[in-house]
A protein has these predicted regions:
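Small-residue-rich segments of transmembrane alpha-helices in multi-pass membrane proteins
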Residues: 50-60, 97-109, 129-130, 173-178, ...
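Short loop segments and helix-boundary regions at transmembrane helix junctions
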Residues: 33-115, 212-223, 242-243
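Loop-to-transmembrane alpha-helix initiation sites
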Residues: 17-20, 66-72, 92, 96, ...
């Protein structure tokens, strides 16, 4: 029985997938804390789909897919900020416009050059078959993002919480927003290998949303989100070995189950908890 439980650890590709997924899940969860604070979960969705044309172009020209995805994500983020700054459109309308435009462009490129683009890898990810070069790319992305987040997390928190106060202490909201979107785009690129473009949104939203239901303190929220993101990613890869199913699907399913548990039973914000308190107060 023990040999069966330890079997996944005997394969190098499984060990690589577990370690990489854990790191990606943790860093994406860290960013998801800020998305919850600002109410920007839709931006995470937009960026996760906006990288598709960059990936498609990179595949078509035999370039590193991470390069194309990163620049597409940055372009999408800057487009959102720019259009919002020069128009009266609401943020959700701008995000929806950019998201649909970039995703449609990606599908168009794929349809025009289908043999050059591995659509399945873009949509579903391929963490179990990831090449060593891609592992190094993802490791560098995660390392740089982690260092920058640890250096600037307090500044980002102030920018997201109160831009007016941030300006009074000499911080530039525009600079830190660009920095955040750059980090988010980079992490989306890393997560593409794990769960694919369609499910990336779950990794940059669900851990933060779950933690948001459990605490009102940002530092605690971030810690809970990171733990949830890392653990579900590790366990998801492990379970997928026995299920012989899509790794990304298993990871996101686990994260969704934990969210539902928090949604129902959170001590302060859980649906059943609030209903119980309402009945007791009658």
């Amino acid at each position: 029985m023990l040999d069966l439980l330890l079997e996944p650890f005997s394969y190098d590709y499984m060990l690589k997938a577990m370690i990489l997924s854990t790191a990606v899940g943790g860093i994406c969860a860290f960013l998801s804390s800020y998305l919850m604070l600002k109410g920007w979960s839709l931006i995470g969705d937009a960026l996760s789909h906006s990288v598709v044309p960059g990936v498609a172009i990179a595949y078509a020209f035999a370039l590193p897919y991470a390069l194309g995805a990163f620049f597409a994500g940055i372009l999408a983020a800057l487009s959102i900020l720019w259009i919002k700054s020069i128009s009266k459109l609401k943020e959700d309308a701008v995000i929806g416009f950019i998201f649909s435009t970039f995703f449609a462009l990606g599908l168009l490129i794929v349809s025009l050059n289908p043999t050059a683009v591995n659509v399945q890898n873009i949509i579903l990810g391929n963490i179990l078959g990831i090449a060593d070069d891609d592992i190094y790319q993802v490791a560098i992305i995660i390392g740089v993002c982690l260092v920058l987040l640890l250096l600037f997390w307090k500044d980002l928190l102030l920018i997201f919480f109160d831009e007016t106060q941030a300006r009074t202490v000499g911080l530039s909201p525009l600079f830190y927003k660009i920095l955040f979107f750059t980090l988010l785009s980079a992490c989306v690129v890393a997560a593409l290998q794990t769960v694919g473009a369609i499910l990336v949104i779950a990794m940059v939203v669900t851990p933060g949303a779950t933690a948001y239901l459990l605490t009102d303190k940002f530092k605690t929220l971030s810690i809970i989100a990171i733990i949830l993101g890392a653990v579900t990613s590790f366990v998801g890869v492990y379970i997928s070995y026995y299920l012989d199913g899509a790794t990304g699907g298993v990871i996101v399913t686990l994260q969704t189950l934990l969210f539902l548990v928090a949604f129902l039973f959170s001590p302060k914000y859980g649906l059943l908890t609030r209903n119980k308190k309402a009945v007791e107060n009658v």
